[in-house]
Amino acid sequence: MKYLAGDFDVVVIGAGHAGCEAALASARMGCKTLICTMNLDSIALMACNPNIGGTAKGHLVREIDALGGEMGINIDHTFIQSRMLNTSKGPAVHSLRAQADKKRYSERMKHLLEKEDNVVLRQLEVIEIDVEDNEVKGVLTKNGAYFTTKAIILCTGTYLKGKIIIGDIIYSSGPSGLYPANDLSQSLLDLGINLRRFKTGTPARINKRSVDFSKMIEQPGDEKIVPFSFIHNKLDKDQISCYLTYTSEETHKIIHQNIHRSPLYNGSIEGVGPRYCPSIEDKIVRFPDKDKHQIFIEPEGENTEELYVGGMSSSLPEDVQIKMYRSVPGLENAEILRTAYAIEYDCIDPQQLDLTLEFKNINGLYGAGQFNGSSGYEEAAAQGLIAGINAVLKIKEKNPLILKRSDAYIGVLIDDLVTKGTNEPYRMMTSRAEYRLLLRQDNADLRLTELGYKVGLVKEDRYNKFLNRKKNVENEIERLRNMQITGKREINEFLLEKGSTELKKPISLYELIKRPELDYFKVEPLDDKRPSLSDDEKEEINIIAKYEGYINKQLEQVEQFKKYEDRLIPKSINYLDIKGLRLEAIQKLEKIKPINIGQASRISGVSPADISVLLIYMERKNREN
């Protein structure tokens, strides 16, 4: 029986990585927030890989942290190994990655929600969204509880009509054996929301006692641990190693012999899977010339023997999986604790959303995470944070927070989803960002903390720490520019020793650092007035000096980009009135409703000629008005 159970400013449906960030942001910005989850023990669940960060994803975590989100702080408290990836490449692609203690990560996030003043956490299944006159009114749960609200954020992950597939065994389920949400999809369809089916998968988990690590390559953590969160100066912890092994000729033979039993190839799987995270059977079919594939053996926590077999997700039948895993060097006696599986689920076409992550046709309804067609914990958390912030800003009748592509990877992520859409689970990559030298993980706080402070998520002590770091970096760069180095004998000897050329005339220390064979750290013996700075401040100064020319070029490109981004398109525009626009362009522009010319130019099917026609039309209208 339906009953009125309470009134909230914001209701968050789902407590995965998107839901947790959305609820915490909403509550910390002063809104009374209800977060509903199918199971209180699955909050911030890592249903697949036991790590946070990695290439481009580490950038997202740093940006979440800079804006006042929780993911970076949570992983800093619960990691068991930390590594900086891509250190042999330029700073634009340096990416922090940490192995998590999955259980502790989840437990700490759950405890944060329980302690947060403005959060009410409930184990409930929402089955219906109540909308009147295109505006959200409330949610109904399976228990009959009805909650009124001003905003709803859908963070349903892979639960909507979830379906587990292992060979020819198919059954209704959420991830990791949890219950699926089978009723909410129909409510969304009734509201006119377009749904689609996507697929993802996860590898088996095996018992550590059954693994022969002597046949594998050990991958320890970095000696110097770099925190994800800018609030942490240093972290120290005994780390647990990961291990690298490879598939064998026998692995490939077993898969080829049983490929007809794979749901991927016999038609059992309808959902579209992630291009950049294929199953092992998909890799072997798609890349027949490769005689082996990397397999990463990763611990799932400090107090468990479970190991994650990274790079070997599968939906093959269980009997085939056993043979397949045991054909990998070091896994000959592997005991499978959890079988690998594929999972299909309902999600939306994200082009139904605007850049705030609110549905265009339903006021107060937002989407975040895998529900929006993305993949990955970090992508989900980033969207949850932005959806939570914007839901509150709208309730408070303030301007929304819309990050541009030149502001953050989060801006690229949301713009790609909303403007371009996606036909497969979307994964963030550094190659998607046009201005990646400006969007480095090391400067995320310098780019975004001011915004986090303005919306109320970054508190005073954190903000003061940020201002101090910013001031230290600026002051040191100014000092280096003004400090002249002359060609004294001892200085030239030092330079020759470093493989550099002698000085013929005075030069600033800042210019000297730019030499390829030198950097801020190497010239310290020439700098007796160097102030005491933190490691991250030193790194920031070094990057700014070394890459100044490239950075300035990208800043010029951003200025060109902003000319289009600043040309706002009137909400009242009728594209049918614009003579010269092609039919496809009219249809796409009507569907996506871009807010500016820049966004319009990135829509697939809208040509440069269409943009020219649109600009001429807007100029004419401006003159008429």
UniProtKB/Swiss-Prot annotation:
PROSITE patterns: GIDA_1, GIDA_2. FAD binds at residues 14-19. SMART domains: GIDA_assoc_3 (SM01228). It holds the Pfam family SAM_GIDA_C. Its cofactor is FAD. It is found in: Cytoplasm. Its main location: cytoplasm. Homodimer. Heterotetramer of two MnmE and two MnmG subunits. This is tRNA uridine 5-carboxymethylaminomethyl modification enzyme MnmG. It comes from Clostridium botulinum (strain Langeland / NCTC 10281 / Type F).
